[in-house]
Amino acid sequence: VCRAVKPDVTIMVDNCYGEFVETVEPSDVGADMIVGSLIKNPGGGLAPIGGYIAGTQKCVDRCAYRLSAPGLGQEVGANLGLMPSLYQGFFLAPNVVSGAVKGAVFTAAVYESLGFRVVPAASEERHDIIQCVELKSPEGMLAFCKGIQSAAPVDSYVDPVPGDMPGYDSQVIMAAGAFVQGSSIELSADGPIRPPYAVYYQGGLTWYHAKLGVLLSLQKMLDAGLVTLP
C-alpha cells in the first residue's frame, strides 16, 4: 500500500516482540529495514543489552554512519566482550520464542475458559509473544501479577504493587523477576490500573516456566476469590 502511493518510500518496521513468531519476517515481505531489542525475542534470554538493525545494505550503512561517522560505519566501536552472549542468544532464540508463544496460547486458553476476554484468543493466529487478559478489576491484576512474580527465578519473594510511571495517567503494575532487567522474553506481566484492567503477559525462557507462571497466577486468583473453577 505504501509503495503504491510512493514507490521510492523507505519502510522501517519496529519488530519488537515479533521475531521468530512467524515463518517470515517483515524484511521478507518488503520492509527495507527492521529493528528490535536484543533483550526481547532475538536475544534468547542471554543477551544482557543491545539492539539490532537488519535490512538493505543502503539502510544498514546509513544507520552505521549515523552512529559513528560517515566512512567509518561499522568498522569502529566497542563490543564490550559481549559478542559470544549475543551470538549464543540469537542461536537459541527460535526455541526460546516457541516456548513463549506456547505459554501465551496456554494463558489465553486457561483464562478464556474461565470467562475472561483475551486478545488474541487461543485459537487465533499470532504475530508476537504478547497475550492480553482483561481481568475485570484492580484486584485481579494484582493477583495475576503476584502469581507471575512468584514463579520468577529472581526476586520471587517480592509482591508487585502499583506505582506511578512517566507517560501514564494511571498507576502501573509490573511483574518481572528476570535475570536481565527489562527483558520481556523472560516471564513478565504488566498493565495500567484502569478499565478494562488488562494485563499484558509475555515471555518465559522455557515453555515449562511459562506454564508454571500461568498456573501460579491462577492460584493467586483462586486464593483471592476472584475466580471459580468449573
Regions found by a protein language model. Give the residues of each.
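Conserved small-domain helix->loop->beta segment predominantly found in fold-type I
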Residues: 81-95, 108-175
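Conserved PLP-enzyme active-site core in the AAT-like
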Residues: 1-98, 102, 111, 117-119, ...
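Short, structured secondary-structure boundary patches
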Residues: 34, 53-59, 135-144, 178-181
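PLP-dependent enzyme catalytic core of the Aspartate aminotransferase-like
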Residues: 170-230
